[in-house]
From Swiss-Prot, chain A:
Protein source organism: Shewanella oneidensis (strain ATCC 700550 / JCM 31522 / CIP 106686 / LMG 19005 / NCIMB 14063 / MR-1)
GO cellular component terms, semicolon-separated: cytoplasm
GO terms, molecular function: translation elongation factor activity
Pathway the protein takes part in: Protein biosynthesis; polypeptide chain elongation
List of glycosylated residues: R32
Record-given protein name: Elongation factor P
From Swiss-Prot, chain B:
Organism for this UniProt entry: Shewanella oneidensis (strain ATCC 700550 / JCM 31522 / CIP 106686 / LMG 19005 / NCIMB 14063 / MR-1)
NCBIfam families tied to this protein: efp_Arg_rhamno (TIGR03837)
Catalyzed reactions per annotation: dTDP-beta-L-rhamnose + L-arginyl-[protein] = N(omega)-(alpha-L-rhamnosyl)-L-arginyl-[protein] + dTDP + H(+)
Active site (catalytic residues): D22 (proton acceptor), E290
Protein name: Protein-arginine rhamnosyltransferase
Amino acids binding dTDP-beta-L-rhamnose: N19, Y20, G21, D22, Y205, Q272, R288, G289, E290, D291, S292
Highest taxon in the source lineage: Bacteria
Keywords attached to this entry: Glycosyltransferase, Transferase
UniProt free text on domains: Adopts a GT-B fold and acts as an inverting enzyme that converts the beta-configuration in the dTDP-beta-L-rhamnose donor to the alpha configuration in the N-linked (Rha) arginine product.
Length: 186, 395
């Protein structure tokens, strides 16, 4: 069991006898600091999609599937190809990467976890923390250094995340892949 | 009194966290569902003492009683009154249902799935964009039952806002005759308030903003009409302790504290109808939380929202989201000042609160006109109870 807070893209959860791969998680704050977690899911048996919402502390029945540490090799549209330590290659559908696709870049060295269901690679879980370079963001608007004023930034790989106002083009930043949040400049 | 089995009834479970907010919302909803839709409602509340402050005739010692057609059960652990599944089950504001209720639902799901009530989580009100995308989504529970998230909100894609059918008509009738407000003040034991005086109600959390405003009102009142600030015993007064002749606990309803031409009045507790009328009768209302915040909007009067503080100042994001909606049709200069006043108040910025209050002149005609038009825009053709009933029908 996991709490909804702990679920992250790439996890597989069980509901009504079917396994669902988590493609996207979105955590927002409700009143009195309570969290709401919205999940985008894909049914691994029926290939259908759905969206669902949980309270942050709700328990979710996750299933442990076979996993392998792999590194990203290349993109062969529409498949991302990963490779394990023994040079076996695994294709993962781009759609199944969900939010993780925004963090995939050529030459990345981070080790990802590829999850298998019925012998087929179905999803990829990124490391909790990654470092990416900011390739575009507007200059600081207000000179705020508190870190609370946020602005959009495009990172290597093409994804867009909210970063602190003081972050500049060329800065390397740490990102929490579970939430897509900017952590700090490194 | 015991709860009878009635498959058509709805259960609403509410835990009282901050005295009058959660119970205020659920009590209004329960009454409206009974009055306007004739739905039998059982309201389960864990703190009847707090509830009795807004429903003075409630007996906190009884496990079950009935008011306004709503059966009110004391939510004890374990439950003193057995839970009998109805048509709908609402857990209000992310409260955790009693174990025996969850167990019954799980058992029903296995043995008679058609008898499982529609399970809803009624969430907090927010004007943030993400609410549109989360409203009405099912939540897959481990038991196999789907629970639906129901989000109140300001757009057509949300669950709407609590507003009784006749509320606006009653308010308009009340506000048309100035004698009504003077009679109300008198009935509340508030003395020496004249028709031309400025009257502000204050129902906030503790904040440095209040002493700043009082200082401003004291100075300003010397040249203008008298100013009266109406405050219930509670958190607002904690911020004004240095202006009071005795500890807050020793203050009596109806007591006046004169500070030059500013008079602080201690309000008695009142029921929800009385609170609505108070908001209708004041020139500006300072409110907090969710229930009073919404009722201040329905009052069609200028207001300041002292939003419930959250970690990492997340409440300021919620405040900004509401301000964006509220100011959509407001003249830019007024919108800017009203926005700054609200932010400054919620952050306890004394100097800024005074500056923006003076710049805004909250009793000015354009802001008042906007306050009158806003409720019609905000309600978006259907209130929360109406949309809730439609949601249940479709589910």
């Amino acid at each position: 069991m996991k709490t909804a807070h702990e679920v992250r893209p790439g996890n597989v959860i069980m509901f009504e006898g079917s396994p669902w791969v988590v493609q996207k998680t979105e955590t927002t704050r409700s009143g009195r600091n309570a969290a709401i977690v919205k999940l985008k899911l894909k049914n691994l048996l029926l290939n259908s999609g759905t969206e669902t919402t949980f309270k942050g502390e709700d328990k979710i029945d996750d299933i442990i599937l076979d996993r392998l540490d792999c590194t990203y090799s290349y993109f062969a549209d529409p498949m991302y190809v990963f490779m394990d330590a023994e040079y076996n290659q695994y294709d993962v559908e781009a759609e199944n990467l969900g939010d993780a696709a925004a963090y995939i870049v050529d030459g990345m060295e981070e080790t990802c976890q590829v999850t298998f269901y019925d012998g087929k690679a179905i999803s990829v879980e990124m490391p909790t923390t990654i470092v990416r370079e900011v390739i575009y963001t507007e200059p600081s608007a207000r000179g705020d250094t508190s870190g609370k004023v946020m602005k959009p930034a495009t990172i290597t790989g093409g994804g867009t995340i909210s970063v602190a106002d003081f972050v500049k083009v060329g800065d390397k930043i740490e990102i929490d892949t579970r939430t897509g949040e900017f952590k700090k400049r490194v | 009194m015991s709860t009878s089995s009635n498959a058509s009834h709805w259960d609403i479970f509410c835990t009282v966290v901050d005295n009058y907010g959660d119970i205020g919302v659920t009590w209004r909803l329960a009454k409206q569902l009974v009055n306007e839709y004739h739905i039998p409602i059982i309201l389960w509340v864990d703190d009847l003492n707090s509830f009795s402050h807004i429903l003075p005739t409630l007996n906190p010692k009884l496990v079950s009683q009935c008011f306004n057609g709503v059966i009110i059960n004391h939510w004890t652990t374990p439950l003193a009154v057995p839970y009998l599944p109805g048509k709908v089950l609402i857990e209000a504001f992310a409260c955790e249902l009693p174990d025996e209720v969850k167990l019954q639902l799980a058992t029903l799901h296995k043995t008679a799935p058609q008898a499982v009530p529609l399970w809803l989580n009624l969430e907090y009100l927010s004007a943030e964009d993400w609410v549109d995308g989360c409203h009405g989504l099912p939540s897959m529970q481990v038991s196999g039952i789907k629970k639906y998230f129901y989000f109140p909100g300001f757009t057509p894609k949300t669950g709407g806002l609590i507003c009784e059918r006749e509320l606006f008509a009653e308010r308009d009738a009340w506000q048309q005759d100035p004698a009504n407000k003077l009679q109300l003040f008198e009935s509340l034991g508030l003395k020496d308030i004249q028709a031309q005086d400025s009257v502000f109600s204050i129902f906030s959390y503790e904040t440095d903003s209040l002493p700043a405003l009082c200082e401003l009102w004291q100075a300003r009142a010397k040249n203008d009409a008298k100013i009266h600030a109406l405050l219930p015993k509670g958190r607002s007064l904690n911020s004004l302790q240095h202006l009071l002749p005795c500890p807050v606990d020793a203050l009596m309803p109806g007591q006046q504290i004169k500070l030059g031409d500013l008079t602080l009045h201690i309000l008695p507790m009142t029921d929800q109808q009385g609170f609505d009328r108070l908001l209708w009768s004041c020139d500006v209302n300072i409110v907090r939380g969710e229930d009073s915040f919404l009722r201040a909007q329905w009052a069609a009067k200028p207001f300041i929202w002292h939003i419930y503080p959250q970690e990492d100042d997340y409440h300021l994001i919620k405040l900004e989201a509401f301000i964006r909606l509220y100011c959509d049709n407001l003249a830019p200069d007024i919108a800017d000042t009203w926005s700054k006043l609200n932010f400054a108040f919620s952050q306890g910025q004394q100097s800024a609160v005074k500056t923006h209050w003076q710049n805004l002149n909250p009793v000015s005609l354009p802001l008042l006109q906007h306050a009158k038009e806003w409720p019609i825009d905000a309600i978006n053709a259907a209130d929360l109870a109406t949309r809730l009933v439609q949601f249940v029908k479709k589910s």
